[in-house]
C-alpha cells in the first residue's frame, strides 16, 4: 500500500491551506491552526484519510475497475496525465466537458470520431486530401485529443473519480454524484467536502503536493492490478489477497 509518510507530506507542503479569509467552515475539523493568515491543515488527520483513500483505489484496481483521474488546473495537468497513463487509467487534464459522465452516449460518439481521424492520420488518408481539408481534419483531431484523448480507452463509465481540487472540478463532482459514482478527492481549506466519499484534506495548489497524491494513487493502482493478474479465483478472492498484503505491509 501507500508508503507516503507525514515527513513526505510536510516536504511537499500538503499542510499549507488557503488564506484564512477564504476558508470553508466545513473544513474546520481538518484545520490545525493558522500561521501568517494561512490555514495549516492537520496532517495527523490527513495521513490516515489519505491511506483510506489509497486503500479504496487499490481495492478497485484489484477488482479490475476503472478510476478516472481528473485535474484540469494548470498545476495538476502534467502530473495527472503522466501518472494516469503510467497506471493505465483514463484521465481528464484539460477542460471538463459538461456531460462527460451524464451524457456518455454523446461523448462515445466523439470518441468514435476521434478514433476515425486518428486512423486516417496514421494510414496516410490525410495526405490524399487537399491542404485545406487535411488542415481542418488535423485541427478537429487535435481539439478532440485535448478534450477526450485521455478517456478514449475508458470504454464506459468509470467506477470512481480521483479528483484534484473539488472547486475547480465542481461539474465533474455533480455528475459523479448524480450517477452514484464514488469520489476520492483532495479538498483544500477553501472547499466544501460534502459529496466527496474519500476526503483527502490537503493543499491542492502546490505542484509538489499534487505530484505526491497522484504518484501514490498510481502506485497503489498498479499494485492492485498486479494482485488481479496474480489471482486465479473470483473477484472476492483477490480483493481479500489485496487486503492481506496491505495489512502485512502496514505491519512490516
Curated annotation (Swiss-Prot):
| Superkingdom of the source species | Bacteria
Does the record's keyword annotation contain Ribosomal protein? yes
Example GO CC term: the record gives:
cytosolic small ribosomal subunit
Q: What Gene3D superfamilies does the entry give?
A: Glucose-6-phosphate isomerase like protein, domain 1, Helix hairpin bin
Question: Which keywords annotate this record?
Answer: Ribonucleoprotein, Ribosomal protein
Q: Which GO terms describe its molecular function?
A: structural constituent of ribosome
Any one of the GO BP annotations: translation
> Into which family does the record put it?
Belongs to the universal ribosomal protein uS2 family.
Q: What is this protein called?
A: Small ribosomal subunit protein uS2
Q: What is the lineage of its organism?
A: Bacteria, Pseudomonadati, Pseudomonadota, Gammaproteobacteria, Oceanospirillales
Q: Which gene encodes it?
A: rpsB
